[in-house]
Amino acid sequence: MTVQPFSPDSDLTLDEAMDELVSAEDFLEFFGVPFDQDVVHVNRLHIMQRYHDYLSKAGDLDEHDDQARYAVFQKLLARAYLDFVESDALTEKVFKVFRMHEPQKTFVSIDQLLS
């Protein structure tokens, strides 16, 4: 799917246009963020989760017009993408599974098993 960056002259609102986006590549193209397909292929879920995390921290943007929101969304997506250009998923620890401590080891003696 070829996606065009958002235009304020469009018949669609920003939210309506974003409803059509289905992949990380769609988001990157829509927001005009240049990307390396190899980076996205390996890190797409991490990039999108980091983008979501950045959006959550940005607070409520609904009071702003589409053009201002587009600029903020674009900046945050570019930042999320660059996190994985400059680093990797294991280092960035976006998902909980990467932040978990080592599994706990418990010793059970033979005596305990036999009793």
From Swiss-Prot:
Keywords: Nitrogen fixation. May protect the nitrogenase Fe-Mo protein from oxidative damage. Homotrimer; associates with NifD. Pfam families: NifW. Belongs to the NifW family. This is Nitrogenase-stabilizing/protective protein NifW. Signal peptide: none annotated. Transmembrane segments: none annotated. One of its GO terms (biological process) is nitrogen fixation. It comes from the Bacteria.
